[in-house]
């Protein structure tokens, strides 16, 4: 029983360490980072792969840069308690 509990705890820990998130990049005003060329987009891909973002791939979806594989600390749209362009 103890070994089963220990294995479960290890799996949960591994999942949280390797967890990556997907979402829309936000600019300094809290809005989605805008793009116009839908689908594969060099601008979005470059923005997502920046060192402080840590994403693995980015593309334009719904006129916003959508990133995959970002670190959990990267803010994504919508920001809690903040509307786009409002304080």
Swiss-Prot record:
Subcellular location: Secreted
Tissue: Expressed by the venom gland.
Annotated source species: Centruroides tecomanus (Scorpion)
Comment field on protein domains: Has the structural arrangement of an alpha-helix connected to antiparallel beta-sheets by disulfide bonds (CS-alpha/beta).
Residues carrying Cysteine amide: 84
LCN-type CS-alpha/beta domain: residues covered: 20-85
Database matches in Pfam families: Toxin_3
Record keywords: Amidation, Disulfide bond, Ion channel impairing toxin, Neurotoxin, Secreted, Signal, Toxin, Voltage-gated sodium channel impairing toxin
Role according to the record: Beta toxins bind voltage-independently at site-4 of sodium channels (Nav) and shift the voltage of activation toward more negative potentials thereby affecting sodium channel activation and promoting spontaneous and repetitive firing. Is possibly lethal to mice, freshwater shrimp and crickets.
Keyword Signal in record: yes
Protein name: Beta-toxin Ct17
CDD domains: neurotoxins_LC_scorpion
Lineage per the UniProt record: Eukaryota, Metazoa, Ecdysozoa, Arthropoda, Chelicerata
Keyword Transferase: no
One of the record's GO cellular component terms: extracellular region
Any one GO MF annotation of this record: toxin activity
Protein family (similarity comment): Belongs to the long (4 C-C) scorpion toxin superfamily. Sodium channel inhibitor family. Beta subfamily.
Signal peptide span: 1-19
InterPro entries named in the record: LCN-type_CS_alpha_beta_dom, Scorpion_toxin-like, Scorpion_toxin-like_sf, Scorpion_toxinL, Scorpion_toxinL/defensin
GO process terms (BP): defense response
Intrachain S-S bonds: 31-84, 35-60, 44-65, 48-67
């Amino acid at each position: 029983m103890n070994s089963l509990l220990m294995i479960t705890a290890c799996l949960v820990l591994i999942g949280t360490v390797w967890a990556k998130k997907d979402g829309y990049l936000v600019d300094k005003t809290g809005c989605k980072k805008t793009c116009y060329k839908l689908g594969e987009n060099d601008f979005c891909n470059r923005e997502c792969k920046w060192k402080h973002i840590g994403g693995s791939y980015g593309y334009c979806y719904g006129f916003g840069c959508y990133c995959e594989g970002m670190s959990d600390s990267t803010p994504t749209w919508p920001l809690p308690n903040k509307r786009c362009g409002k304080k």
